[in-house]
Amino acid sequence: MSARRLARLEWRDYCNRVSKQLEGQKAELEVVGLDLGDHVEARWIPLYGLVYEPEGDIFEIALEGIDHLIAHPTDLLVEETLRGLVTIEVIAADDTHQILRLREPLPLPVPLR
């Protein structure tokens, strides 16, 4: 199992596509950074969705009661297993890692060829 890095041009479409399926899924959000240490910002609460706005270069993770914004993200990584999507990681310009874990893997559609 390894994370796959998405090209920046894919971010908006990917977020739009998976957000429809993610809505209501239980998720945990962990933030890891040199200045912050390692802490869990949200523990197994409903996820509303993911948004990337290229105009402002802002990535948003919307959870119940939390609107987590990441300014100037540099990388978006997704971890997928045979059961589906399990983790989404957003790395900010200051090298802070936002790690979103899904309680249950999200089944993904078979890619068209």
Language-model features and meaning:
Residues 36-46:
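Short coil-to-beta-strand transition motifs
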Residues 1, 29, 112-113:
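Mixed-charge (acidic/basic) macromolecular-recognition segments
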Residues 32-34, 65-66, 91-95:
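Short, flexible beta-strand-to-coil junctions
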